[in-house]
Structure formats: structure tokens, C-alpha cells
Amino acid sequence: MKTLGEFIVEKQHEFSHATGELTALLSAIKLGAKIIHRDINKAGLVDILGASGAENVQGEVQQKLDLFANEKLKAALKARDIVAGIASEEEDEIVVFEGCEHAKYVVLMDPLDGSSNIDVNVSVGTIFSIYRRVTPVGTPVTEEDFLQPGNKQVAAGYVVYGSSTMLVYTTGCGVHAFTYDPSLGVFCLCQERMRFPEKGKTYSINEGNYIKFPNGVKKYIKFCQEEDKSTNRPYTSRYIGSLVADFHRNLLKGGIYLYPSTASHPDGKLRLLYECNPMAFLAEQAGGKASDGKERILDIIPETLHQRRSFFVGNDHMVEDVERFIREFPDA
């Protein structure tokens, strides 16, 4: 049985130029995930369920666990002295770590994706993304360090808190998964070099918003529901409402996750930096594809910290089908 720490160090030795800083950074994220796991499991016994009464920069009501997870991850990253700053879905602006100007990395994160599901005991997750800073080492980081396209990511991953807690990550050399053993306090390797199955058979979308979707997406949903044995249709509809949980299931079983634009969110709802980019990096490393319906997610140059985007991610052939329908059936 190989632990996450052992696996990361083993992979580090494959790179002659490795300094160990990225290894230490991933270790900090691992620690934060353990703390969040512990408190999610007793969320109903302590006062961290429900809304906090505050709103984030997007005007969304923050859950108490959102804020808790944000603070724990931020503290774990700052304590290691290897991160120059962070950007978080729960922070209005970037957070510059004083005294860490020498650090080479910045971290972007969604501390608790799907947190509204906590009250009903549904799986939630943590998403993280790591970049090398572009401003000179030795100076405080600026927004420029965070507004990089996804193809510049050094590492990305997520933690899914479900029937078991699992950490999945990539450094650009495949996707690897580790299950948390609470009796030992360690993440243990359970799947190495994960890949999407050759053919997907599940589509994940909130069909309650069907009337608000673009024409191309409506046509694709009907395509998924039609019977065609040659393409293994109709597909199965599965939607949890937590990006991490839906993506993880589709990675294992094969499928596509869709979050298109609507009239109320014409640019889409998911955040490019905190959700789309890291999941797109993971998807491509697992043989899948991620798109906003027109272009590759990882090639989009971000303009603002909390920029939103339409998001389609999963098996490559399924994402390509969505893109085709969007091209062929544009909105009037």
C-alpha cells in the first residue's frame, strides 16, 4: 500500500530539476483536506451547517462550511511558506501572504464546491489549481500571477467528500487517486493513471432549467434521450448538483457534465479559474475534453478573478457532440 506522500516523493525523483517545493505544497493541501473531512463528518453536531448570513463577491449566500474550509486551507498553505498568495471563490480579492515573497507558486481554489448539499448529506468537494507566478520572485504577487490561462497550470486536483474521502490530482503526468484511511490518517493510492472509459453513457445537467438553455444544448439533450443502438443511446441522466461529485462519477463510468449559459447567466455560472480550469486539466490528462461550447477551456485567457464560463467536460466524443450541436443550432 502506497501513501500519497510516498507517491509524490517517488514522482518527484523522476524530475532532476525538482526542488521539493511542489511536493510540500501538495502536502499542505492534503492537510487541509484532512481537517475539512474531519469537520464535515461532524457538521451536524457542531454549528457549521447552514448559511453564514454573508455573501461572496458573486452575491451568493455563503455557507458556514464555505468559510470554514476557506480559512483552514488558507492557513495550511500559508504555514508552509511555499505559496506567495491565493485566490479563492470565497475571497473578493487575491490574498497576498506576507513574508512569502520568495515563494514561486500561487494557488487558486474552491474550498467547498457544492456546499449547499451539506445540509442534506450529499457529496461535496474541494477544488485546487497551482500555477508558477509570473511576477519576479522576491516581490509581492499581483493579480497578474493569477490571471493565467489554464494551460499554464502546474498541478490541479480535487477532493471529494462522500462515502469515502478521495483526493485526485495531476501534475501533467496522468491522473492519480487516493482514498483517505481515517484509522491511519493517510491517503492511500487506489487508482493510478485514471482514464475516461472509451465510450461515455451518462449526461449530467440540471434539466429543470431546460427552457432557459441555448438551442444547441436543448438539441443535445434530446439527442441523448433518443434511442440509437449504434451509439449506445439513450444515455442515462445523472445529476448530483456538486461539480466534483458529478465529474468524479463520469470519470469512473464515462459521461459528460454540462453547465451551459442561461438568460440569467449569459456567460455561464461556473468560475473559470476556480472550477473550469482545474477540472479541464484533469479531464484532458484522463483522455477527455473540456470546452465552453466553442473553444478549449485551457486556452481561454482570463480577464477577472471571478470570471464565469459555460462548461462542458467529459468524454471527448460527447464534448465534441455538444460543440457540434451548438454550432449547428445557434440562438436566433
UniProtKB/Swiss-Prot annotation:
Domain of life: Bacteria
Cofactors named for this entry: Mg(2+)
Reaction(s) this enzyme catalyzes, per UniProt: beta-D-fructose 1,6-bisphosphate + H2O = beta-D-fructose 6-phosphate + phosphate
A molecular function GO annotation: fructose 1,6-bisphosphate 1-phosphatase activity
Summary of activators and inhibitors of this protein: Subject to complex allosteric regulation. The enzyme can assume an active R-state, or an inactive T-state. Intermediate conformations may exist. Activated by three-carbon carboxylic acids, phosphorylated three-carbon carboxylic acids and sulfate. Strongly activated by phosphoenolpyruvate and citrate. Inhibited by AMP, which affects the turnover of bound substrate and not the affinity for substrate. Allosterically inhibited by glucose 6-phosphate. AMP and glucose 6-phosphate act synergistically as allosteric inhibitors. Phosphoenolpyruvate antagonizes inhibition by AMP and glucose 6-phosphate.
UniProt family annotation: Belongs to the FBPase class 1 family.
Annotated TM spans: none
Gene name as annotated: fbp
Binding partners and assembly: Homotetramer. Phosphoenolpyruvate stabilizes the homotetramer.
PROSITE patterns xref list: FBPASE
Major location (coarse): cytoplasm
Keywords for the protein's UniProt record, in alphabetical order: Allosteric enzyme, Carbohydrate metabolism, Cytoplasm, Hydrolase, Magnesium, Metal-binding, Nucleotide-binding
Record: residues binding substrate: D113, G114, S115, S116, N206, Y239, Y257, L258, Y259, K269
Positions with a binding annotation for beta-D-glucose 6-phosphate: K222, Q225
Enzyme Commission code(s) on record: 3.1.3.11
Protein name: Fructose-1,6-bisphosphatase class 1
Binding site for Mg(2+) 1: E89, D110, L112
One Gene Ontology term, aspect cellular component: cytosol
Residues noted as binding citrate in the record, renumbered to the chain: T3, L4, G5, K30, F187
BP-aspect Gene Ontology terms: fructose 1,6-bisphosphate metabolic process; fructose 6-phosphate metabolic process; fructose metabolic process; gluconeogenesis
